[in-house]
Amino acid sequence: MMTGQVPILVLKEGTQREQGKNAQRNNIEAAKAIADAVRTTLGPKGMDKMLVDSIGDIIISNDGATILKEMDVEHPTAKMIVEVSKAQDTAVGDGTTTAVVLSGELLKQAETLLDQGVHPTVISNGYRLAVNEARKIIDEIAEKSTDDATLRKIALTALSGKNTGLSNDFLADLVVKAVNAVAEVRDGKTIVDTANIKVDKKNGGSVNDTQFISGIVIDKEKVHSKMPDVVKNAKIALIDSALEIKKTEIEAKVQISDPSKIQDFLNQETNTFKQMVEKIKKSGANVVLCQKGIDDVAQHYLAKEGIYAVRRVKKSDMEKLAKATGAKIVTDLDDLTPSVLGEAETVEERKIGDDRMTFVMGCKNPKAVSILIRGGTDHVVSEVERALNDAIRVVAITKEDGKFLWGGGAVEAELAMRLAKYANSVGGREQLAIEAFAKALEIIPRTLAENAGIDPINTLIKLKAEHEKGRISVGVDLDNNGVGDMKAKGVVDPLRVKTHALESAVEVATMILRIDDVIASKKSTPPSGQGGQGQGMPGGGMPEY
């Protein structure tokens, strides 16, 4: 700098900046910290995490997406890893822990290459070459099947390790039944809209009391005690308008000078409700499910006619009811005809736990169904709900794709072996990155073994030996403390879950590697008395975020 030259201040006072290798190192450490936080939850023998929020509410789970969503993460790079988990969960419903653990390991391997002087861009290019080759290998080794036995295995794999205990077989059957019920074929392609599977939960009973309903469960009771508890051969009217006297849009007053006219006025109101109920009765409906309110007088006349009615049904439930029963939602009672009514074998009010619910059951060819989860505590039913939602998603995408892969780390072991060989055919320093990618994949079988208390080194050696012999379905056998044939054990993973996890991990790893400058603005209202680093986050002089 020339003598007397005044330094130019570009950033505001208090802004902290990290550049070059320091920025890269801190970003990598943050990503590794997040990966390590969920790594012990991977696989059927993975451990659970207890999460306590600021008001003392407790969540016990080993679901990666749930854990990361509930964690209070501040580091910007750590937040990027959490976003990977969210993206994986949104796209395919499972494999969140795998994606995060792979992200952390890819960055760990990249750190070694950075120490050797390999440029981040070269590492990123090598990783992209590796993931493209991995996609080809996965397509080659994928198995084809959409039969119920395969779908059941997919469900069991998704449920394993969750807090569903001895109920996995039972729950897997419910999941397959639900997915098959809502599956449709459009233009020769199988489509499964999992939004048409309603998952409800109620405390009480055991997990084995969980029910599949060929129809929809509504968390509402009938509006009048005199209405029937059970309606057989139900003809269902779905009404999106209030069975009430409409209020005028302008303020109006009615002045009655003759006291005898008061009764006439009340009679007119009563007649209006009678006409409403008469229209419903004339259509042939014996069940009314209304999205809006039902007046007390209308309730009385509906009960008098033996018509079962529920009010203020959620819009989402109304849409599912239409798909399940074949009914059309009407907004005007004049449009209520026999042709717009839905059908169900039974509509029944049942007491579930402390609540009364309406069951619309026995729908013919329903395109929307329900699963009602039972369990002893809030923690149990919530974890079963998370497990079922994951299982439903992965079974649905397997049904759509018609392909699956062998689980237990078998795919990662096969990819690691083939990519190591592929690296030899690639010139330049990208070869080193592809080799690092192959080595990073071994974190999955290694972690599965570690979490089960099995020697990871011996397991990896045996696994490599089996795959060198061409046995692509051999993975980590957690039951026999070694390696085994996943085909014989029925351990399978959906193809889309694996490919998406790989792609997401590579995307975030390459993005983080290319960051060489972190500029953090000063907090406007920093918490008093805090200094140093946030607990659990890596240090190395990283500014607080």
Curated annotation (Swiss-Prot):
PTM note: The N-terminus is blocked.
Region (Disordered): 522-545
GO molecular function, one term: ATP-dependent protein folding chaperone
Keyword Nucleotide-binding: yes
Keyword annotations of the record: ATP-binding, Chaperone, Nucleotide-binding
Complex formation: Forms a Heterooligomeric complex of two stacked eight-membered rings.
PANTHER family: CHAPERONIN (PTHR11353)
The protein, known as: Thermosome subunit alpha
Species: Thermoplasma acidophilum (strain ATCC 25905 / DSM 1728 / JCM 9062 / NBRC 15155 / AMRC-C165)
Organism ancestry: Archaea, Methanobacteriati, Thermoplasmatota, Thermoplasmata, Thermoplasmatales
